[in-house]
Amino acid sequence: MRKNTAILFDLDGTLLPMDQDEFVKYYFGYLARTMEPYGYEKDNLIAAIWTGTGAMTGNDGTCTNEERFWKTFEKITGRRREGEEERFYQFYQTGFQKAKAVCGYNPLAADTVRKLKEKGYQVVLATNPLFPSVATESRIRWA
């Protein structure tokens, strides 16, 4: 008989309780307010992000999701990745952290993961690969 060596958890909504609609509303609202001083118009910015996200979900594997997102974002906004990527990275390191306020907390999550690791299991977290890694790492810490 084969022994299980890995345990798979869903991050969003399981280890990190959240109402997806509330989270997206808060996140996009804060992102739009943060980017407004740099000349971004809220509706255009949000449309560019949704369209870029859609492009990632349709990715055929010929490029990374990140490359696919930025190519789409550049077409819609007329802005170059090289000039904007650092600005967005800074947002995810600072402003995005405020989105933790609309996430819940499951006190059993961290304890369960810790106990499984102590027993020698590999713990794998599943999430849609649609956020930049800095945002995914933040959501893991929040859980």
Regions inferred by a protein language model and the residue ranges of each:
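Short, flexible/disordered intra-domain loops and linkers
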Residues: 20-25, 62, 133-134
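Active-site neighborhood of HAD-like aspartate-dependent phosphohydrolases
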Residues: 1-50
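A metal-dependent, Asp-based hydrolase signature
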Residues: 46-93
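Residues within well-ordered alpha helices
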Residues: 34, 72-73, 115, 139, ...
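Short, electropositive alpha-helical surface patch
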Residues: 63-68, 136-137, 141-142
